[in-house]
Amino acid sequence: MPKSLLLVLALALLAQTALANGPQGSSDRNWIRLG
């Protein structure tokens, strides 16, 4: 499995948990952008 695909899956999982967390999701998305 290509590392890029693994990275996309990890980001998708993070985004999903961020949405599930509600208001906290915005800060999580900012962290993803900075990271």
UniProtKB/Swiss-Prot annotation:
Modified residues (Leucine amide): 34
Leader sequence residues: 1-20
Superkingdom of the organism of origin: Eukaryota
GO cellular component: extracellular region
Intracellular or extracellular location(s): Secreted
Keywords: Amidation, Secreted, Signal, Toxin
Tissue: Expressed by the venom secretory cell of the spine. The spine is a cuticular structure containing a single large nucleated venom-secreting cell at its base. It is an independent unit capable of producing, storing and injecting venom. On the back of D.vulnerans caterpillars, spines are grouped together by 50 to 100 to form scoli, of which there are eight in D.vulnerans.
Gene Ontology MF: a single term: toxin activity
Entry similarity comment: Belongs to the limacoditoxin-13 family.
Protein task: Probable toxin. Shows a moderate antiparasitic activity against the major pathogenic nematode of ruminants (H.contortus, EC(50)=94.5 uM). Does not show insecticidal and antimicrobial activities. Does not induce increase in intracellular calcium in mouse DRG neurons, suggesting that it does not induce pain.
Record-given protein name: U-limacoditoxin(13)-Dv73
Lineage of the organism: Eukaryota, Metazoa, Ecdysozoa, Arthropoda, Hexapoda
